[in-house]
């Protein structure tokens, strides 16, 4: 025996068989070991040939019988160092070598080894024992070589028998298991026309990811099964080639090319009865390319041009441009078929066609309104992906959510079960106690437990009954799907008796059983819901995008209606601005906003420190419960023309192209946001040109060519233009109307008309009056009080102290900001000194009053928490009447617990 004259597969088989003999401690290496090694490989030729000859379970039976025979062989312990081959094994190999020479093979292939093995009397008897005739196994093995009898001319030659079966799957065979294809008739007809050509009969499907390119080929497979194709395509096999399987495990140089050649040879031998489908056809270009070898595309080209190979390719537009168009010789052999994204109505039709498949898989019922919602919401809110893929994913995930809820216990039962467990633990603990109180409690617990069990039992029974009904419906739907597949198979084989039995017998029985079970659920079903409705789809959209599209709950309705009032708690005055913003949010959440524009776009004008930026922060806090979720762009950083690229990302060829823009990336990740362009007048005019498209159509294309959706964002721009006119109006030099007109004149002079014309509203913020500034001072003092509250310290402040702070810090030109600066410098600094000097203890109160030319600070024990009642006071205690220093301590004591309201009924912040 010369191993060099054996194929790699033969050598591997003999080595495995030898290892089997060594591990078992057998004295000889026999044909039985060889049979054991061959049958243990599930993808090998031997088990496949036995299954074809004797039925589906024949290979498993043969493996069992061979293993039993191996166990009966005598074994030695320890095993011998060298195990000789038995005379019967040598005869097997000699017979195989004789057959090899007669066939003209250069290497001994596995199929010849099997043919030699089948001549062995012991193996023949074992196969007869399981009812498999060796003659039939031989004929199945011979079929592997094909009609012309392929020759094995290399060490890897026998790996390519049945190459199409090994490296592909027949879509026509699996047509019944594929999802139904709705629409796409024009594309399928175009593919059929190209396939019917004499030469260059190779269509390539190109389109965006997720538009249904592979579905077109699956639709063709289903038409071939039904016979709805021209004569040239009847009875053809549509094989989907797995390029990964072709490349995987090709260890030796030339092995990949040999595999591919064998696939192409099988296609050629089929004489037009095989059409190859290569998904992601760009992978063919460069596949298997190493130094000194050619890639797969060059092996395809000659056959593609001559029309010997009919091939359907599929790839995305980007990859087609990137890979296929570069190889003009490869590209010209394919005819392009563009697969466009379906419209929303077409997507709804596709979803209706798939509805039954998803209902059967998940065991739920999908409402038609949910399908319409999925198509509409995905088209509107999920950008960067394409229909119908994103709509199908929405339906699938919504069904999965409902299914998960069905498989878990209802909340009502779960709560009662937990309570029952707690009472049982308490019962066991009390049973050991001897005192009267425990015995009395024991009687109570037993009674509670009995009541709970009485309540729980009917609920559990109802839940189990409903669960069983839903599970049975799911099982029947899956059975119906399997029967429909069997029906298609029977019709394809023209087994009319079987088809009639299925259509008018089994399938009708299953459908009537499903209808009966679904009919019983018409009563009010409080325990479990198996329906997937529009609200489930909306919930998934909200989870994916962060955009609240779910139906408005009662709490949220109240929040939206009271949005303006809550914004006023943080922003003093500025009614026009607050109302404009809150109304825009209300329109958006009610679903009546303009669909193709941002939720709202505003230009806030006014002097510094009047609350323009504060309103944007307050809005972000109300919408997202966190003011930091504001997308803030400081326009003072965009004073040069080239800085526009920082907003939308650098163009190709520039450093930072891969990073994306500061604005576009932030909005792409969180489409539902508040965008603040602060100090907008300081930016270069080129920046405004970029924003025109955002304000008009709610979209912007970034540096990488991706379209970013701004339709769910609120855009706020702030500017100080014309602030001096408003200050003149405040001091009485001119009327406020004249001042506003002057401001608008300045704005029109600075900004282009096309920008101003696209804004929803231009809001002029009025300078803050003295009373409004006092409210601001109180809000700032609350901020200090919140910081102190972390130490358990309450803060009390008199009106006199607030008036003193205002008198010291008020500057009409700078608005409210000087108040914060003065407070930080004076009040916070003094409090910090008192903390460091340990004058302020935990759970004490600091009260601030106006003294002679300065603020006076007093500390008293008893702070946020009252020791006697355990109640918390407000973090900021406001002393409205402004008691003098001598009376202040008593006033603080009285007001520590109760809530104090100012003259404007403004609520204090609670800890």
From Swiss-Prot:
One of its GO terms (biological process) is response to heat. It comes from the Eukaryota. Residues 164-410 are annotated as: I. Gene3D superfamilies: 1.10.8.60, Clp, N-terminal domain (1.10.1780.10), P-loop containing nucleotide triphosphate hydrolases (3.40.50.300). Residues 532-723 are annotated as: II. CDD domains: AAA, RecA-like_ClpB_Hsp104-like. It holds the Pfam family ClpB_D2-small. Residues 403-500 form a coiled coil. Changing residue 706 to K: In hot1-5; unable to acquire thermotolerance. Residues 85-147 are annotated as: Repeat 2. Induction: By heat stress and oilseed rape mosaic virus. Regulated by HSA32 that retards its decay in a positive feedback loop (at protein level) during recovery after heat treatment. Signal peptide: none annotated. Changing residue 599 to I: In dlt1-1; normal growth and development under nonstress conditions, and normal chaperone activity and thermotolerance function. Compromised positive regulation of HSA32 during recovery after heat treatment. Changing residue 499 to T: In hot1-4; reduced basal thermotolerance and unable to acquire thermotolerance. Keywords: ATP-binding, Chaperone, Coiled coil, Cytoplasm, Nucleotide-binding, Nucleus, Repeat, Stress response. Changing residue 637 to K: In hot1-1; greatly reduced basal thermotolerance and unable to acquire thermotolerance. Belongs to the ClpA/ClpB family. Over-expression of HSP101 partially reverse the sensitivity of 14 day-old seedling to heat stress. Molecular chaperone that plays an important role in thermotolerance. Together with HSA32, required for long-term acquired thermotolerance (LAT) in plants and naturally high basal thermotolerance observed in germinating seedlings. This is Chaperone protein ClpB1. The lineage of its organism: Eukaryota, Viridiplantae, Streptophyta, Embryophyta, Tracheophyta. The gene is CLPB1.
